[in-house]
Amino acid sequence: MIFIDACFRKETPYTPIWMMRQAGRYLSEYQESRKKAGSFLELCKNSDLATEVTLQPVEILGVDAAILFSDILVVPLEMGLNLEFIPKKGPHFLETITDLKSVESLKIEAYKQLNYVYDTISQTRQKLSKEKALIGFCGSPWTLATYMIEGEGSKSYAKSKKMLYSEPEVLKALLEKLSLELIEYLSLQIQAGVNAVMIFDSWASALEKEAYLKFSWDYLKKISKELKKRYAHIPVILFPKGIGAYLDSIDGEFDVFGVDWGTPLEVAKKILGDKYVLQGNLEPTRLYDKNALEEGVERILKVMGNQGHIFNLGHGMLPDLPRENAKYLVQLVHAKTRR
Protein backbone atom coordinates (compact mmCIF):
# COMPACT_ATOMS: atom_id res chain seq x y z
CA MET A 1 0.00 0.00 0.00
CA ILE A 2 1.47 3.31 -1.13
CA PHE A 3 -0.07 5.19 1.81
CA ILE A 4 1.40 2.79 4.40
CA ASP A 5 4.82 2.84 2.70
CA ALA A 6 4.76 6.64 2.86
CA CYS A 7 3.90 6.55 6.59
CA PHE A 8 7.14 4.61 7.12
CA ARG A 9 9.16 6.86 4.77
CA LYS A 10 9.63 4.11 2.19
CA GLU A 11 9.96 4.94 -1.49
CA THR A 12 6.62 5.36 -3.28
CA PRO A 13 5.78 5.90 -6.98
CA TYR A 14 4.11 9.21 -6.07
CA THR A 15 3.05 11.17 -2.98
CA PRO A 16 -0.17 9.64 -1.60
CA ILE A 17 -3.14 11.86 -0.89
CA TRP A 18 -6.37 11.66 1.08
CA MET A 19 -8.50 14.39 2.66
CA MET A 20 -9.88 14.91 6.12
CA ARG A 21 -13.69 14.80 5.96
CA GLN A 22 -13.42 13.35 2.46
CA ALA A 23 -16.72 11.55 3.09
CA GLY A 24 -19.09 14.46 3.53
CA ARG A 25 -21.82 16.79 2.37
CA TYR A 26 -19.96 18.06 -0.72
CA LEU A 27 -20.75 14.61 -2.21
CA SER A 28 -24.38 14.09 -3.31
CA GLU A 29 -23.85 10.34 -2.80
CA TYR A 30 -23.09 11.01 0.89
CA GLN A 31 -26.25 13.07 1.24
CA GLU A 32 -28.31 10.22 -0.23
CA SER A 33 -26.77 7.71 2.23
CA ARG A 34 -27.42 10.05 5.15
CA LYS A 35 -31.01 10.50 4.04
CA LYS A 36 -31.45 6.71 4.02
CA ALA A 37 -30.04 6.50 7.57
CA GLY A 38 -32.39 9.18 8.92
CA SER A 39 -29.78 11.05 11.00
CA PHE A 40 -26.04 11.52 11.32
CA LEU A 41 -25.82 9.30 14.41
CA GLU A 42 -27.87 6.56 12.77
CA LEU A 43 -25.54 6.74 9.77
CA CYS A 44 -22.59 6.12 12.11
CA LYS A 45 -24.41 3.14 13.67
CA ASN A 46 -25.60 1.58 10.40
CA SER A 47 -22.59 -0.47 9.28
CA ASP A 48 -23.89 -1.06 5.74
CA LEU A 49 -24.45 2.65 5.08
CA ALA A 50 -21.29 3.72 6.95
CA THR A 51 -19.31 1.32 4.74
CA GLU A 52 -20.94 2.84 1.65
CA VAL A 53 -19.96 6.34 2.80
CA THR A 54 -16.40 5.30 3.72
CA LEU A 55 -15.84 3.93 0.21
CA GLN A 56 -17.41 6.83 -1.73
CA PRO A 57 -14.36 9.18 -1.82
CA VAL A 58 -12.06 6.35 -2.91
CA GLU A 59 -14.37 5.48 -5.79
CA ILE A 60 -15.22 9.08 -6.76
CA LEU A 61 -11.95 10.96 -6.12
CA GLY A 62 -9.31 8.24 -6.39
CA VAL A 63 -7.67 9.02 -3.03
CA ASP A 64 -5.03 6.57 -1.73
CA ALA A 65 -6.72 5.86 1.60
CA ALA A 66 -10.23 5.55 2.99
CA ILE A 67 -10.92 6.81 6.48
CA LEU A 68 -13.53 5.05 8.57
CA PHE A 69 -16.84 6.91 8.63
CA SER A 70 -17.76 7.42 12.27
CA ASP A 71 -17.57 10.17 14.89
CA ILE A 72 -15.14 10.80 17.74
CA LEU A 73 -18.07 11.16 20.16
CA VAL A 74 -19.28 7.54 19.94
CA VAL A 75 -16.83 6.76 22.76
CA PRO A 76 -18.36 9.15 25.36
CA LEU A 77 -21.79 8.11 24.05
CA GLU A 78 -21.08 4.47 24.93
CA MET A 79 -19.55 5.56 28.25
CA GLY A 80 -23.05 6.66 29.21
CA LEU A 81 -23.49 10.27 28.08
CA ASN A 82 -26.60 10.74 25.95
CA LEU A 83 -25.73 12.45 22.68
CA GLU A 84 -27.81 14.28 20.10
CA PHE A 85 -26.83 16.14 16.95
CA ILE A 86 -28.75 19.39 16.60
CA PRO A 87 -29.17 20.60 12.98
CA LYS A 88 -26.96 23.63 12.18
CA LYS A 89 -25.56 23.52 15.72
CA GLY A 90 -23.74 20.20 16.08
CA PRO A 91 -23.27 17.66 18.88
CA HIS A 92 -24.86 18.15 22.29
CA PHE A 93 -24.53 15.97 25.40
CA LEU A 94 -27.61 15.87 27.63
CA GLU A 95 -25.42 15.16 30.70
CA THR A 96 -22.00 16.64 31.43
CA ILE A 97 -18.98 15.87 33.59
CA THR A 98 -18.85 18.27 36.54
CA ASP A 99 -17.00 16.49 39.35
CA LEU A 100 -15.17 13.31 40.37
CA LYS A 101 -18.46 11.51 41.04
CA SER A 102 -19.62 12.06 37.45
CA VAL A 103 -16.24 10.79 36.15
CA GLU A 104 -16.54 7.68 38.31
CA SER A 105 -20.10 7.04 37.09
CA LEU A 106 -18.92 6.74 33.46
CA LYS A 107 -19.13 3.18 32.15
CA ILE A 108 -15.87 1.32 31.65
CA GLU A 109 -15.10 -0.99 28.71
CA ALA A 110 -17.29 1.15 26.45
CA TYR A 111 -15.11 -0.05 23.56
CA LYS A 112 -16.93 -3.40 23.83
CA GLN A 113 -20.18 -1.64 22.85
CA LEU A 114 -18.81 -0.30 19.56
CA ASN A 115 -19.38 -3.35 17.38
CA TYR A 116 -21.11 -1.20 14.76
CA VAL A 117 -17.75 0.53 14.22
CA TYR A 118 -15.81 -2.74 13.96
CA ASP A 119 -18.45 -4.14 11.57
CA THR A 120 -18.04 -1.09 9.33
CA ILE A 121 -14.28 -1.64 9.33
CA SER A 122 -14.44 -5.33 8.42
CA GLN A 123 -17.05 -4.72 5.70
CA THR A 124 -15.05 -1.82 4.25
CA ARG A 125 -11.78 -3.73 4.28
CA GLN A 126 -13.42 -6.59 2.37
CA LYS A 127 -14.72 -4.23 -0.33
CA LEU A 128 -11.73 -1.87 -0.53
CA SER A 129 -9.01 -2.49 -3.11
CA LYS A 130 -5.92 -4.20 -1.66
CA GLU A 131 -3.79 -1.23 -2.80
CA LYS A 132 -5.83 1.23 -0.73
CA ALA A 133 -5.31 1.73 3.00
CA LEU A 134 -8.10 2.01 5.56
CA ILE A 135 -7.52 4.50 8.38
CA GLY A 136 -9.20 4.12 11.76
CA PHE A 137 -9.41 6.99 14.23
CA CYS A 138 -10.51 8.43 17.54
CA GLY A 139 -10.53 11.80 19.27
CA SER A 140 -7.83 12.73 21.76
CA PRO A 141 -8.60 12.47 25.49
CA TRP A 142 -8.44 16.28 25.84
CA THR A 143 -10.75 16.97 22.89
CA LEU A 144 -13.29 14.36 24.08
CA ALA A 145 -13.07 15.72 27.62
CA THR A 146 -13.96 19.25 26.44
CA TYR A 147 -17.16 17.98 24.81
CA MET A 148 -18.01 15.94 27.91
CA ILE A 149 -17.46 18.91 30.25
CA GLU A 150 -18.90 21.71 28.08
CA GLY A 151 -21.73 19.56 26.69
CA GLU A 152 -21.02 20.85 23.18
CA GLY A 153 -18.46 22.70 21.10
CA SER A 154 -17.16 25.89 22.71
CA LYS A 155 -15.34 29.10 21.82
CA SER A 156 -13.77 29.68 25.23
CA TYR A 157 -13.67 26.17 26.81
CA ALA A 158 -14.24 28.01 30.08
CA LYS A 159 -15.68 25.04 32.01
CA SER A 160 -12.92 22.68 30.86
CA LYS A 161 -10.16 25.17 31.67
CA LYS A 162 -11.72 26.07 34.99
CA MET A 163 -11.58 22.36 35.89
CA LEU A 164 -8.00 22.12 34.62
CA TYR A 165 -6.76 24.95 36.85
CA SER A 166 -9.03 24.60 39.90
CA GLU A 167 -9.67 20.83 40.02
CA PRO A 168 -6.86 19.25 38.00
CA GLU A 169 -7.32 15.88 39.74
CA VAL A 170 -10.88 15.63 38.31
CA LEU A 171 -9.71 16.37 34.77
CA LYS A 172 -6.79 13.95 35.13
CA ALA A 173 -9.16 11.19 36.28
CA LEU A 174 -11.30 11.80 33.19
CA LEU A 175 -8.31 11.90 30.82
CA GLU A 176 -6.91 8.71 32.34
CA LYS A 177 -10.23 6.91 31.96
CA LEU A 178 -10.57 8.07 28.36
CA SER A 179 -6.99 7.04 27.51
CA LEU A 180 -7.59 3.46 28.66
CA GLU A 181 -10.78 3.28 26.57
CA LEU A 182 -9.09 4.73 23.48
CA ILE A 183 -6.13 2.31 23.60
CA GLU A 184 -8.54 -0.63 23.52
CA TYR A 185 -10.87 1.05 21.01
CA LEU A 186 -8.04 1.61 18.50
CA SER A 187 -6.68 -1.89 19.20
CA LEU A 188 -10.06 -3.39 18.27
CA GLN A 189 -10.18 -1.21 15.15
CA ILE A 190 -6.79 -2.65 14.16
CA GLN A 191 -8.01 -6.18 14.84
CA ALA A 192 -11.09 -5.47 12.69
CA GLY A 193 -8.88 -4.51 9.75
CA VAL A 194 -7.68 -0.88 9.69
CA ASN A 195 -4.17 -0.38 8.30
CA ALA A 196 -3.36 2.84 10.19
CA VAL A 197 -4.86 4.85 13.05
CA MET A 198 -5.18 8.59 13.53
CA ILE A 199 -5.91 10.58 16.68
CA PHE A 200 -7.61 13.95 16.21
CA ASP A 201 -6.80 16.58 18.84
CA SER A 202 -9.21 19.12 17.39
CA TRP A 203 -9.18 21.51 20.35
CA ALA A 204 -5.44 21.38 21.07
CA SER A 205 -5.11 25.13 20.51
CA ALA A 206 -7.43 25.90 23.44
CA LEU A 207 -4.52 25.42 25.85
CA GLU A 208 -1.34 27.35 26.59
CA LYS A 209 1.84 25.38 25.99
CA GLU A 210 2.51 24.07 29.51
CA ALA A 211 -1.11 23.03 30.02
CA TYR A 212 -1.23 21.44 26.57
CA LEU A 213 1.84 19.30 27.13
CA LYS A 214 0.61 18.13 30.54
CA PHE A 215 -3.11 17.67 29.88
CA SER A 216 -3.15 16.59 26.26
CA TRP A 217 0.17 15.69 24.68
CA ASP A 218 1.26 13.42 27.56
CA TYR A 219 -1.90 11.35 27.07
CA LEU A 220 -1.42 11.20 23.29
CA LYS A 221 2.11 9.93 23.89
CA LYS A 222 0.82 7.30 26.30
CA ILE A 223 -1.75 6.01 23.79
CA SER A 224 0.63 6.00 20.81
CA LYS A 225 3.40 4.31 22.82
CA GLU A 226 1.09 1.46 23.83
CA LEU A 227 -0.23 1.06 20.28
CA LYS A 228 3.29 0.94 18.80
CA LYS A 229 4.24 -1.63 21.44
CA ARG A 230 1.28 -3.82 20.46
CA TYR A 231 1.24 -3.16 16.70
CA ALA A 232 4.61 -1.93 15.43
CA HIS A 233 3.50 -2.47 11.81
CA ILE A 234 0.52 -0.09 12.12
CA PRO A 235 1.30 3.60 11.52
CA VAL A 236 0.06 6.03 14.17
CA ILE A 237 -0.86 9.53 12.95
CA LEU A 238 -1.35 12.40 15.41
CA PHE A 239 -3.15 15.61 14.44
CA PRO A 240 -3.08 18.27 17.16
CA LYS A 241 -4.72 21.26 15.49
CA GLY A 242 -3.33 24.74 16.07
CA ILE A 243 -0.16 24.05 18.05
CA GLY A 244 2.38 25.30 15.50
CA ALA A 245 4.03 27.41 18.20
CA TYR A 246 4.67 24.33 20.38
CA LEU A 247 6.41 22.11 17.81
CA ASP A 248 9.78 22.27 19.55
CA SER A 249 8.24 20.31 22.47
CA ILE A 250 6.71 17.54 20.34
CA ASP A 251 8.14 14.06 20.88
CA GLY A 252 6.90 10.51 21.29
CA GLU A 253 6.53 7.14 19.60
CA PHE A 254 4.37 7.74 16.55
CA ASP A 255 4.94 7.85 12.79
CA VAL A 256 3.10 10.73 11.15
CA PHE A 257 2.44 14.28 12.35
CA GLY A 258 -0.58 16.05 10.84
CA VAL A 259 0.14 19.71 10.08
CA ASP A 260 -2.80 22.14 10.08
CA TRP A 261 -3.01 24.94 7.51
CA GLY A 262 -2.04 27.60 10.06
CA THR A 263 1.42 26.06 10.55
CA PRO A 264 3.93 26.75 7.74
CA LEU A 265 5.14 23.39 6.42
CA GLU A 266 8.72 24.65 6.21
CA VAL A 267 8.63 25.30 9.97
CA ALA A 268 7.17 21.86 10.72
CA LYS A 269 9.70 20.24 8.39
CA LYS A 270 12.64 22.02 10.02
CA ILE A 271 11.59 21.01 13.56
CA LEU A 272 9.91 17.61 13.03
CA GLY A 273 10.75 16.46 9.50
CA ASP A 274 13.70 14.28 10.51
CA LYS A 275 11.69 12.42 13.16
CA TYR A 276 8.23 12.13 11.63
CA VAL A 277 6.56 11.93 8.24
CA LEU A 278 4.44 15.07 7.79
CA GLN A 279 0.84 15.06 6.58
CA GLY A 280 -0.91 18.13 5.21
CA ASN A 281 -1.55 20.96 4.81
CA LEU A 282 -3.46 22.63 1.96
CA GLU A 283 -5.84 25.36 3.11
CA PRO A 284 -9.26 23.78 2.37
CA THR A 285 -10.81 26.95 0.92
CA ARG A 286 -8.23 26.88 -1.90
CA LEU A 287 -10.47 24.18 -3.37
CA TYR A 288 -13.01 26.85 -4.29
CA ASP A 289 -10.69 28.03 -7.08
CA LYS A 290 -8.49 25.93 -9.38
CA ASN A 291 -5.74 28.55 -9.67
CA ALA A 292 -5.55 28.94 -5.89
CA LEU A 293 -5.52 25.16 -5.56
CA GLU A 294 -2.64 24.81 -8.05
CA GLU A 295 -0.65 27.54 -6.32
CA GLY A 296 -1.13 25.87 -2.92
CA VAL A 297 -0.11 22.45 -4.24
CA GLU A 298 3.00 23.91 -5.91
CA ARG A 299 4.06 25.61 -2.69
CA ILE A 300 3.62 22.47 -0.57
CA LEU A 301 5.43 20.16 -2.99
CA LYS A 302 8.31 22.61 -3.28
CA VAL A 303 8.80 22.47 0.50
CA MET A 304 8.28 18.73 0.96
CA GLY A 305 9.97 17.14 -2.05
CA ASN A 306 9.59 13.42 -2.72
CA GLN A 307 9.75 11.68 0.65
CA GLY A 308 8.47 12.07 4.18
CA HIS A 309 5.15 13.55 3.08
CA ILE A 310 1.50 12.55 2.75
CA PHE A 311 -0.63 15.16 0.99
CA ASN A 312 -3.77 16.26 2.82
CA LEU A 313 -5.74 19.35 3.68
CA GLY A 314 -4.83 21.41 6.72
CA HIS A 315 -8.36 20.85 8.05
CA GLY A 316 -11.53 19.10 6.86
CA MET A 317 -13.39 19.40 3.55
CA LEU A 318 -16.10 22.07 3.63
CA PRO A 319 -19.70 21.13 2.72
CA ASP A 320 -19.96 23.33 -0.39
CA LEU A 321 -16.55 22.70 -1.98
CA PRO A 322 -16.83 21.68 -5.66
CA ARG A 323 -16.29 17.93 -5.95
CA GLU A 324 -14.64 18.32 -9.36
CA ASN A 325 -11.91 20.40 -7.71
CA ALA A 326 -11.37 17.71 -5.07
CA LYS A 327 -10.99 15.16 -7.86
CA TYR A 328 -8.63 17.50 -9.72
CA LEU A 329 -6.51 17.92 -6.57
CA VAL A 330 -5.94 14.15 -6.36
CA GLN A 331 -5.01 13.93 -10.05
CA LEU A 332 -2.71 16.96 -9.76
CA VAL A 333 -0.78 15.64 -6.74
CA HIS A 334 -0.37 12.22 -8.35
CA ALA A 335 0.81 13.73 -11.66
CA LYS A 336 3.21 16.27 -10.15
CA THR A 337 4.89 13.80 -7.79
CA ARG A 338 5.13 10.73 -10.03
CA ARG A 339 8.74 9.53 -9.98
From Swiss-Prot:
Catalytic activity: uroporphyrinogen III + 4 H(+) = coproporphyrinogen III + 4 CO2
GO terms under biological process: protoporphyrinogen IX biosynthetic process from glutamate
Subcellular location, principal: cytoplasm
EC number(s) from the headed UniProt entry: 4.1.1.37
Protein name per its UniProtKB record: Uroporphyrinogen decarboxylase
Annotated keywords: Cytoplasm, Decarboxylase, Lyase, Porphyrin biosynthesis
Recorded metabolic or biological pathway in which this protein acts: Porphyrin-containing compound metabolism; protoporphyrin-IX biosynthesis; coproporphyrinogen-III from 5-aminolevulinate: step 4/4
Function: Catalyzes the decarboxylation of four acetate groups of uroporphyrinogen-III to yield coproporphyrinogen-III.
Annotated positions binding substrate: 21-25, 71, 147, 202, 315
GO molecular function terms noted in the UniProt entry: uroporphyrinogen decarboxylase activity
Subcellular location(s) per record: Cytoplasm
Signal peptide: none
Database matches in PROSITE patterns: UROD_1, UROD_2
Site (Transition state stabilizer): 71
A single GO cellular-component term on record: cytosol
Quaternary state and interactors: Homodimer.
Protein family membership: Belongs to the uroporphyrinogen decarboxylase family.
